[in-house]
Amino acid sequence: MTDEFPEQYREGLRLFNEEEFFECHDVLEELWSETLGTDRKFLQGLIQASIALFHFGNENFGGAKKLYLSARKNLDPFGDEFMGILLSTFLQDFERCFQELLDNTENYPTTVALRDELVPKIRATAEGLIG
């Protein structure tokens, strides 16, 4: 069943779950550049989510917030499941991870940090999709 998904996609998901967000971005961006249609918008959202987390972890809060909002805009329309992942679960976890930053009104917050226990994971609907 997982043969229907490109190897780059599976590798990108694996890297995301290992919190290798910049590397995830690189792998998925290569696939994104070759993709057409609705899958392209979905991949763009995953790329934005990975870089939002990368920025958050590096305390680039403005970049993190901006890319979080862009990722949500691109991923929200895809429903509960898409391209073999439990998207609604991921988006709930993604929002929970960013909630403190989103609620903060300071330009340069000093009390906000990416909390390891809140970093979202991508869960698959297809066995073996994420290695």
Language-model features and meaning:
Residues 7-23:
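Alpha-helical segment of the N-proximal tetratricopeptide repeat
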Residues 21-22, 61-62, 68:
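TPR-repeat structural position
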Residues 25, 29-33, 72-80:
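Amphipathic alpha-helical segments of tetratricopeptide repeats
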Residues 47-48, 80-102:
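TPR/TPR-like alpha-solenoid helical repeat scaffolds
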